[in-house]
Amino acid sequence: MKTFFLTFRSITQAQRAERAYGKAGLGCVLRRTPRWMEERGCGYGVEVKCPDLKTGLEVLRREKIPFRKSYLLHADGGVEELGHDLP
């Protein structure tokens, strides 16, 4: 399993994502967004464990939950930005 961090425009969207991942059986934790990741938005995101990003994003799309950015969290502490959803 890989660990991804997804940022959202509002805490409500982040909370909806947390519930959707729970329903899908994926491990997920609501967290404060690190300050360097904040661009615009609420300052909250979700850390989710899933086999790949596609699996994680399918849950959000099925529930119609837009996200701002996605990141892969490496075991060594590194972070890799993967993509955007919202303009």
Summary of predicted features, one role per range:
Residues K54-P87:
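C-terminal structural segments of small proteins and small subunits
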Residues K2-T12, A17-G22, L26-L57:
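Amphipathic, hydrophobic secondary-structure cores in small proteins
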